[in-house]
Amino acid sequence: MITVVDLYHVLTAVVPLYVAMTLAYASVRWWRIFSPDQCSGINRFVALFAVPLLSFHFISTNNPFAMNLRFLAADTLQKLIVLALLALWCRLSARGSLDWLITLFSLSTLPNTLVMGIPLLKGMYAAAADVDSGSLMVQIVVLQCIIWYTLMLFLFEYRGARLLVMEQFPDTAASIVSFRVDSDVVSLAGGGGGAAELQAEAEVGDDGRMRVTVRKSTSSRSEAACSHGTQSHSQSMQPRVSNLSGVEIYSLQSSRNPTPRGSSFNHAEFFNIVGNGKQGDEEKGAAGGGGHSPQPVVGKRKDLHMFVWSSSASPVSERAAAAAAGAVHVFGGGGADHGDAKGAQAYDEYSFGNKNEKDGPTLSKLGSNSTAQLRPKDDGEGMAAAMPPASVMTRLILIMVWRKLIRNPNTYSSLLGVIWSLVSYRWGIEMPAIIARSISILSDAGLGMAMFSLGLFMALQPRIIACGNSLASYAMAVRFLVGPAVMAAASIAVGLRGVLLHIAIVQAALPQGIVPFVFAKEYNVHPNILSTAVIFGMLIALPITLVYYILLGL
């Protein structure tokens, strides 16, 4: 039976977190103490130092040889059940899509265990002699950081790769045998690597197979160079050394944007290949009008074709120009105009990489602002769009996921924490005091700073409920009803009973995790829904978890 003293212990553990969040919110919204730039600096510090060191502290002090495998099995089974049901829904339902699979999986299975779960569950079940609820929450955090967040990145990059292939290679994707991604591109979403656009170059060999190179567009490169104070475009944009001799190059570039934009075609490299003598004629022809397509340059070697385009190009002009030039038809799709979303400042504060990346193309879909639907649409003959071989897509996705992981400080803190805990508890080695205190001086402030940062984020948003009341209600139902229900079923299935079962259910009813929102904003997959789940969910999480705590204790 839950007593008043038990409730007081719970409030003692949780209310200070809400005090820090409220102070941050008031400092921005009411008192105007912090400017958006100052909030960005605070949140950047939290994302890069406070939270990773807090994770390292909890993980490194947890005994990996005393982990409750049955509890972890219940958590894993819950996520696998949800993932399987969502995949089945996407396969059988016309309304199912990869976007909604990712969003619903995040809402139902990825709570804010590190910041809210550890202090809340410690306050609720501190009196349980045979159960260390804090240690159980740390074990959940380890799985989240190492396995489930990595799975989320895999799904997001898979989505980005599908979108890139479907837009740029709608008819010839099955002929792609390899992808090469430049080192400065760290994401396939919305241009990746902090650029507004991606440029894809396809080389077609004698066997008809395509080898695609993905890089930042030259226009975005020149803009970045100009922003760093280069003297001129010609000085900042040195042409790449080309090993092509006598190849045919088709550059088809048009834009839906009404404002002029620098072309992504590298004229310097083009004229180095075909000769400088025709430079004036080519420029004159290019300026003559959009109705004329570039003519292919016939060289001595005709066994290789290179197609260069930008992800923002118009599909209509590309198809017409390709037909006029007699080129192989490999163009299709195109990105929509990029708009600056309100609250983008707040996203930068939580981002671990791509800090200057803009939102990708958006499309209204069920009241949210996710990017285009990724379910392949059937053509007139009912045939679905072909995709590259699974091995090619898998290698591309793994490369991009690896680049994201190595730029995330939480990856290092989690892995180092696990390694140190294994060494420490296996051989009884203690961390040197000078290192331990250097870490603790920041990790001790991690919880408070994380909640303070969340309050700043809430204050910077124009609306608490950004996705509309109906979608917000739907998201809250998934977060606080569906997630705990599936966790209860999974826990009972693996044999959890008593206090362990209660902890598993209450843990599943925690507010939405922040990291899934960061991913959703970066990849533009229903960010408004995840934003509402984080903000509004945090406000109603305490009474909801208390209701679960009281009902389970009856």
UniProtKB/Swiss-Prot annotation:
A Gene Ontology biological process term: auxin export across the plasma membrane
Composition bias type Polar residues, residue spans: 228-240
Keywords (A to Z) from UniProt: Auxin signaling pathway, Membrane, Transmembrane, Transmembrane helix, Transport
Expressed in which tissues: Expressed in roots and shoot apex. Expressed in roots, stem bases, stems, leaves and young panicles.
TM region positions: 7-27, 39-59, 69-89, 101-121, 136-156, 415-435, 439-459, 476-496, 499-519, 534-554
UniProt membrane topology term: Multi-pass membrane protein
Binding site for (indol-3-yl)acetate: 51, 112, 114, 149, 514-515
Topology, Extracellular side: 1-6, 60-68, 122-135, 436-438, 497-498
Signal peptide start and end residues: none
Matching InterPro entries: Auxin_eff_plant (IPR014024), Auxin_Efflux_Carrier (IPR051107), Mem_transp_PIN-like (IPR004776)
Top-level lineage group: Eukaryota
Principal cellular location given in the protein's record: membrane
Stretch list, region Disordered: 214-240, 275-298, 352-385
One GO location term (cellular component): endoplasmic reticulum
Protein localization: Membrane
Cited function: May act as a component of the auxin efflux carrier.
Similarity remark: Belongs to the auxin efflux carrier (TC 2.A.69.1) family.
PANTHER family: AUXIN EFFLUX CARRIER COMPONENT 1B-RELATED
Protein name per the record: Probable auxin efflux carrier component 1b
